[in-house]
């Protein structure tokens, strides 16, 4: 433990809190271009083929982002908008792709929670 004299000379530094989605640079969303679209498997207790895309952002960073919902139309060179938010069972996936924006189509035949998946109101 430091002495009072040491604390006077060099006071305690507050801990710096880092953002969980640093590559967005304090923006709510960022635009990017898909460089690779593929599926990956989740961590131990779960089993699935999760759809993810590697995205090069406008600020130059490359991030892995999750494609939510059933079916998608993304391929290489698709322009997408990403938001923060990790996927708990996919290590390294800290971003989500927004559906129904730019080149990404909304989820077809979606009836509940439509706004989260960019789906229009069914007639």
From Swiss-Prot:
Region annotation (Disordered) ranges: 1-30
Lineage of the organism: Bacteria, Pseudomonadati, Pseudomonadota, Alphaproteobacteria, Rhodobacterales
Residues modified to 3-methylthioaspartic acid: 89
A cellular component annotation (GO) from this entry: small ribosomal subunit
Lineage: superkingdom: Bacteria
Basic residues bias locations: 9-21
Pfam families documented for this protein: Ribosom_S12_S23
GO molecular-function terms, A-Z: rRNA binding; structural constituent of ribosome; tRNA binding
Full protein name: Small ribosomal subunit protein uS12
């Amino acid at each position: 433990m430091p002495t009072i004299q040491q604390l006077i000379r060099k006071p305690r530094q507050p801990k710096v809190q880092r953002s969980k989605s640093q590559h967005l640079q304090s923006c709510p969303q960022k635009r990017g271009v898909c460089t690779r679209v593929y599926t990956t498997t989740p961590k131990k207790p779960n089993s699935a083929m999760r759809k993810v895309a590697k995205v090069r952002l406008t600020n130059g960073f490359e991030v892995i982002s999750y494609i939510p919902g059933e079916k998608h139309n993304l391929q290489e060179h698709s322009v997408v908008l990403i938001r923060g938010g990790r996927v708990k069972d996919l290590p390294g996936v800290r971003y989500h792709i927004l559906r129904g924006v730019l080149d990404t189509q909304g989820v077809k035949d979606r009836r509940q929670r439509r706004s989260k998946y960019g789906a229009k109101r069914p007639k």
